[in-house]
């Protein structure tokens, strides 16, 4: 079980992702934008940040950069409909973020998260 923060501006996608990850046994919190996610990251530790690349205000890449300052152990996975275009020319991204392109199947999302996290313990435990 991992503690996951989902940052996604689309309400239905955010709910869909959170529900699937909870059914897979993870503890999930959600944020509607990058600024809300930063506030949540300041209050608690997470194992994984699952962020949409394109969000109003603060995009997922900037969110990941800021999150890495406070939680360097945080794993990052981006979800986007156009990963190659959205991430082109983005230098200074923390760690080795994974990218999952929309559309995707839930079993692929869960499998990639499980692979990314391995047997990591719950953050803050």
Q: Residue spans of the language-model regions?
A:
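Active-site residues of response regulator receiver
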Residues: 52, 80
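Acidic catalytic/metal-coordinating carboxylates
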Residues: 33-36, 59-63
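Acidic, metal-coordinating helix/loop segments flanking the phosphotransfer/catalytic sites
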Residues: 5, 30-48, 68-69
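Receiver (REC) domain active-site loop signature in two-component systems and cognate sites
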Residues: 55
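Alpha4 helix (beta4-alpha4-beta5 surface) of REC/receiver domains from two-component response regulators
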Residues: 62, 82-101, 107-112
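Charged docking surfaces used in two-component/phosphorelay signaling
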Residues: 15-23
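Conserved phosphotransfer cores of two-component systems
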Residues: 26, 42-46, 66-74, 85-94
